[in-house]
Amino acid sequence: MSDLNNEILYKMQTAFPLNQRPFLTLSKEFNIDEDELILRIKELKKANIIRQTSAIFDTKRLGYKSSLVAFKVKPKDIEVAVKAINAHPGVSHNYLREHEFNIWFTLAITPDSKLSLEETVNILKNQSNAQESIILPTLKMFKISVKMDTTGKVAKKEKLKKRDFKDIKLTPLDIEIIKELQKDIPLKIEPFKDIIERLNITYQELFNRAKELQEAGIMRRFATILNHRKAGFNANAMSVWEAPEERAEELGKLLASFSAVSHCYLRPTYPNWKYNLFAMVHAKTEEESDAIIEEMAKETSLTNYTKLYSTKEFKKQRIIYFSSEFKRWEEQFI
């Protein structure tokens, strides 16, 4: 892939402009014309390097309850388990990982769900013939920022910024805007034109509301998401660490400061699960990933840790917020 395409990909992951002609804005940064930029992006999309470009919303701030969940499933039951888990509209990620707890997925339920998160997990556990399950909600988030360093120029460590959010009450228009902005944008000169026409609003109204949603932390960012493997990031390791409770926050922040870490959380422990810090590491090779994790261990002085590489991706797609599919799924069990 050309250096210019790598620069474009990194920029679109970090700062996609929200204006009437975002591709024009971006093209000026790279000293190419708008049509050439759109053509390059279309080629990257066709090659399946770009997954989608859309708003990324905060599940919790929208009132949804969510958790990471792990199942221990016998090899003969994996196919059945995957079918059951993937059928839930609140499952956005589902992976096979190298561990006795071998199926790992994220699950979200709506604010008005008739079933609790635990009840939903139990239904999926029974459908999956899982032997054991653990529910690992976020107790503290240290970092969430999926940005693949396609340029090779990003520093090994980064400073984390603490953000304060203002409270807003979602209006019916906000909900309609969220429904629209969560979709992949069309690759054309005015990608937001269809939205303002459907909602019968102006560009100014759309971008003002989007800014409000960002200031409230409801919309984390508007960005391009890549297919990690297609973009050359073939090693996807979930590193898990046993940290002393009194130092968990300090050490979580230290793990999160590594640029190769996209997500870093504090989660609960159980008799059958002793690790409380989770840090997702993305690298081009397992050797590179292992070296990063070794460096993380050295800096934190943590000795009890392991890494769970994903060996198969069963599902990776955005949750469709305010979708009727959640209610439809629940109605089978109520």
What are these regions (language model features)?
Residues 1-334:
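A compositional/biophysical signature of low hydrophobicity enriched in polar/charged and small residues
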